[in-house]
From Swiss-Prot:
GO terms for molecular function: cyclin binding; ubiquitin protein ligase activity. GO terms for cellular component: cytoplasm; cytosol; nucleoplasm. This is E3 ISG15--protein ligase Herc6. RCC1 repeats lie at residues 40-91, 92-144, 146-197, 199-252, 253-303.
Length: 1003
């Protein structure tokens, strides 16, 4: 049973469909015609047929509904009417159109003025359409896989195809909506809407009467592409309906908001004068579950009272007001159906038209139903648990074919994939990440355990989804797929790096600033597990490209894209440790010589075209481990040196080394004097040091022991260049230096030279120094490293309860390095209390690490970067820079043994060698370090040598058992006599350990 109101009628007609068991499923109305779809999926039409809109073979109008014979053999699922055209969607989503077509609104490929018979829209063949909505002269359709199509007139931008797009006689994809999981499309007179599954409303077309609810100072009259409507963002919209020049939206709470033209009172009974934008319809008497707009009126089903009400000029009015007219006088809310009209029945659906309204009903077994009649719309396909279960159990051919179709649809569509994992959004809630990534990961894991499903998903991603990723979309919901895809294990498979991971990265690389900014914001708030999955996927792709790629133009493009994308993730990272981005494999597979060449070309701009496209890995140091960073630092230094030689050819004749000749008894004095005279160019050369009367620098020098000795002297507390707050603590710069500031500049150069020459030094600074070198701010934790008692005291100040801190009698005045200092003006009279204690601690730390040493630290900083390149060093972490300079005090001594080499008749199984390693491993740690000092000139290993350094054993024929071992420190060579007993071996090792300082002449 259903009710209808035709033009001129004041009361509803109560009708039956006729044949027993046949019910009215849907009604649609144009300006002067209607379509009725019954439960047997037959379509009837009535009204004006001047433009063939009834789909009848003859052109006469009819008041009684008559079947559309051309559709009798088709299983019609839904219908829609424009002003003078009609559209029907049949089984499997085939679309037919008829009526007026001069504006292209039929979508049949031509601007045919009249089409009396339903014609199949061929452009949509093979696409399953699940929703269709007609405006006056345009049509919208939503497909099962989430695409929106539009066709017809585009005078006001109502097709959403862009400003320069004309009217279309063939359905066109609305590309601006690609990737958005949509719930509904709705067409009005000259405007259009789409509603996403998360409740976001998108509007486009005419806004001349405010029907798009745009806000702002300069509201546009037309929008040519879908625009997210901010005024509706927090309303939790679940349904949208459009009239000629007005729009109504229904919320989860059962409220109705209207906006647009109010020429016939279609918005609300008492429109607020001058107000634009969504207005709540008040006085409706309850909660609403359905709304529908006709051209100039709005109807609603108030389920809490059982009423169907109307606002505006309904079918009983025949005038044609324009939006300039004042609201109709009789614009109160009209009750079309009251609860007493619905005895033993309840409202199922409501339909509104310019000349007719319809209400369908269904029987209830009791007088008061507890259910809520909602408008149920066909939805885009998406994954759910029952589908996953069905797919995994699909063993029969027929079942598997159906499963393949469903899987292919979902995994070929960004919108469907996103829709599958949307989170439930509460009213007014605005989630940044609306998808459940953990659920996605679990579902993908279940699916990919089935080989046939895994293979099919791979094909779909490769051939469809990744090629059409919505990277240019301005809408955030479309970009959620970029968070979902890495969760699929198929994307992580190194075999798929080129077809999947790279294509994914390429889409991100193409993004505009706005889209990329949103993605970065999402990355910054991802759970650690999801962010790590993304990083590991990109790392695997980079490794695969370097391992298997040939240095072609495509190789350069691929690696540049991958590195740029992981760089964006790195910049956004707030949670993962820096080590997560390091690609440890690079040190073994990367060509550092080729990198030096690329750096040289770019630095000297030798080929502008090649230089602009070149990948220079030193721009991405965060993916390199510490040994590789140091190698790249050496590459950079070599490039700078060669570049200067190219610019000034006369420098070619200068010595290839920076040579220092020093006296052991005047080590610091001789070194600083010569460094004052060194040109910047020479600082980038390899250092060669010779001790006068001991070893010539031309013979190879002894740089390791030189650095060990000079830093041992200059950092000695007795030298008084630095202060030690406590005995055995780290050292720091003094407040009142006893040396000229130039000495700290030269000390900085020495530190830079040690790093440049890969020589580790004993530099007992806290981590704070390395933070300052990297322009990072030292903290209270760093102060604890410098002075543990002071750091603990300040921590206790922070931990003090409000009433206890005043009892400490502390003021903004401190004592540091034998000097009283006010942290603020007149700090001696400003007590520390609960309010200012954090400021006190902050200023204390800042004074020690920054303010008190500003002048001499700046000199040190300047000296260090006189040798080292800031662009390279800045990409080190403080801990890495510290390790690069002071080396590793710990060593894998077994690995040290395995790395050793043997000459002059020695091999690893020689009896003397077996004795040596047995005796060596029996040494204490301190003894081993002293032996290392004897062997290399330093008691610790440089990070570059941890994996590779060992001893080079040799034995001269002139040696006897009475001789002691000798070392060549620059080559890690040990001249070891062929001892035959453990007693003699241990005795010889003790001689070496106890004589570990001093240079040994080279033969």
């Amino acid at each position: 049973m259903y009710f209808s109101w035709a033009a001129g009628s004041r009361k509803p007609r109560r009708l039956k469909a006729g044949t027993s068991g046949i019910e009215l499923l849907q009604a649609a109305s144009g300006e002067h015609h209607s379509l009725l779809l019954f439960s047997n999926h037959r379509v009837y039409s009535c009204g004006d047929n001047s433009w063939g809109q009834l789909g009848q073979r003859r052109d006469q109008s009819t008041e009684r509904p008559e079947p559309i014979q051309a559709l009798n053999d088709l299983h019609v699922d839904l219908v829609s009417c424009g002003k003078e055209h009609s559209v029907a969607v049949c089984h499997k989503g085939k679309v037919f159109a008829w009526g007026a077509g001069s504006e292209g609104q039929l979508g049949i490929g031509e601007f045919k003025e009249i089409s009396f018979m339903p014609t199949k829209i061929k452009a949509l063949a093979g696409i399953k359409i699940i929703q269709v909505s007609c405006g006056h002269y345009h049509s919208l359709a939503l497909s099962e896989d989430g695409h929106v199509f539009s066709w017809g007139r585009n005078s006001e931008g109502q097709l959403g195809l862009g400003k320069n797009s004309r009217s279309q006689a063939i359905p066109q994809k609305v590309k601006s909506l690609e990737g958005i999981p949509l719930a509904q499309v709705a067409a009005g007179g000259t405007h259009s809407f789409a509603l996403s599954l998360t409740g976001t409303s998108f509007g486009w077309g005419s806004n001349r009467s405010g029907q798009l609810a745009l806000s702002g100072n300069k509201v546009k009259e037309q929008i040519y592409k879908p625009h997210s409507i901010g005024a509706l963002k927090n309303l939790s919209v679940i349904y949208i309906s459009c009239g000629y020049e007005h729009t109504a939206v229904l919320t989860e709470e059962g409220q109705v908001f209207t906006f647009g033209g109010n020429s016939s009172g279609q918005l609300q009974p008492s429109p607020r004068s001058g107000q634009r934008g969504p207005q709540l319809i008040e006085g409706i008497g309850g909660r609403v579950s359905q709304i529908e707009c006709a051209s100039y009126h709005t109807i609603a089903y108030v389920y809490t009272t059982g009423q169907v009400v109307s606002l505006g000029r309904g079918p009983s009015h025949t005038s044609n007001p324009t939006h300039q007219e004042a609201p109709a006088e009789n614009s109160d809310i009209t009750c079309l159906l009251a609860a007493e009209d619905l005895v033993d029945i309840e409202v199922k659906d409501i339909f509104a038209g310019a000349h007719a309204n319809f209400v369908t009903t269904r029987r209830v077994s009791h007088t008061r139903s507890t259910g809520v009649s909602m408008k149920i719309l066909p939805e885009i396909i998406r994954i759910n648990q029952s589908l996953v279960k069905k797919w995994r159990a699909a063993n029969k051919r027929k079942d598997r074919e159906g499963a393949k179709r469903e899987i292919s649809l979902i995994f070929s569509s960004s919108a469907c994939l996103t829709a599958s994992f949307l989170k439930k959004r509460d009213a007014g809630e605005n989630n940044l990440i609306d998808v459940d990534l953990k659920l996605a990961r679990d579902v993908f894991k279940k699916l990919t355990t089935e080989k046939w499903i895994s293979s099919l998903i791979t094909t779909c991603l490769e051939e469809y989804l990744l090629r059409d990723l919505p990277y240019s979309s301005p809408h955030q919901e479309a970009l959620l797929v970029f968070l979902l895809l890495p969760e699929c294990s198929i994307m992580q498979d190194p075999k798929n790096w080129k077809t999947l991971a790279f294509e994914f990265a390429k889409a991100i690389h193409k993004m505009g600033p706005q889209s990329l900014a949103f993605l970065r914001t999402c990355w910054a708030s991802l759970e650690v597990s999801s962010l790590n999955i993304l990083v590991q996927m990109l790392k695997k792709a980079i490794i695969s490209q370097i391992q298997y790629g040939v240095a072609t133009e495509q190789y350069i493009t691929n690696i540049k894209v991958l590195l740029e994308v992981i760089k964006e993730v790195h910049k956004a990272n707030c949670q993962l440790p820096e080590s997560a981005f390091i690609i440890n494999e690079l040190s073994g597979i990367f060509n550092f010589d080729a990198e030096a060449g690329r750096m040289f070309i770019r630095h000297n701009d030798l080929d502008c075209t090649e230089s602009s496209d070149m990948v220079v890995f030193s721009d991405f140091l965060f993916v390199f481990d510490l040994p590789s960073k140091i190698k790249l630092m050496k590459c950079d230094s070599f490039v700078k040196l060669m570049s200067e030689v190219m610019a000034f050819p006369e420098k070619m004749s200068s010595p290839p080394y920076l040579i220092l000749k020093v006296r052991r008894s005047h080590l610091v004095e001789d070194t600083l004097r010569q460094l004052r005279q060194v040109e910047d160019f020479d600082l980038r050369k390899q250092l060669s040091v010779g001790f006068i009367n001991e070893i010539r620098p031309e013979a190879g020098g002894v740089s390791s022991e030189f650095f060990h000795c000079i830093f041992e002297e200059m950092t000695d507390p007795k030298y008084e260049m630095f202060i030690y707050p406590e005995k055995g603590s780290s050292m720091w710069f003094p407040v009142n230096p006893k040396f000229e500031k130039s000495s700290y500049f030269l000390f900085g150069i020495l530190c830079g030279l040690s790093l440049h020459n890969l020589k580790v030094i004993n530099l007992p600074f806290p981590l704070a120094l390395y933070k300052k070198l990297l322009n990072q701010k030292p903290s209270l934790e760093d102060l604890k490293e410098l002075s543990l008692p002071l750091g603990r005291n300040l921590q206790e100040v922070l931990n003090c309860e409000a009433g206890d801190i005043e009892e400490l009698h502390m003021y903004f005045s401190i004592y540091w390095d034998q000097k009283d200092v006010d942290l603020i003006p007149d700090g001696i009279s400003v007590p520390v209390n609960e309010t200012n204690k954090r400021d006190y601690v902050s200023k204390y730390v800042d004074y020690i690490f920054n303010i008190s040493i500003k002048t001499i630290y700046e000199e040190f900083h300047r000296g260090f970067y006189k040798v080292c390149n800031w662009d390279i060093i800045r990409q080190f972490q403080p801990e890495e820079l510290m390790t690069a300079i002071i080396g590793n005090a710990t060593c894998d001594w077994k690995q040290f043994e395995n790395n050793s080499k043997y000459k002059d008749g020695y091999d690893k199984s020689h009896p003397t060698i077996l004795l040596f390693w047995k005796a060596f491993h029996d040494l204490t740690l301190d003894e081993k370090k002293k032996f290392l000092l004897f062997l290399t000139g330093c008691d610790r290993l440089h990070v570059k040598g941890l994996q590779n350094e060992g001893i080079v054993f040799r034995c001269s024929e002139t040696f006897s058992e009475e001789d002691n071992p000798r070392s060549l420190t620059c080559h890690r060579m040990l001249d070891l006599p062929k001892y035959s007993s453990m007693r003699r071996m241990k005795e010889a090792l003790q001689v070496a350990i106890n004589n570990s300082t001093g240079f040994v002449s080279q033969e």
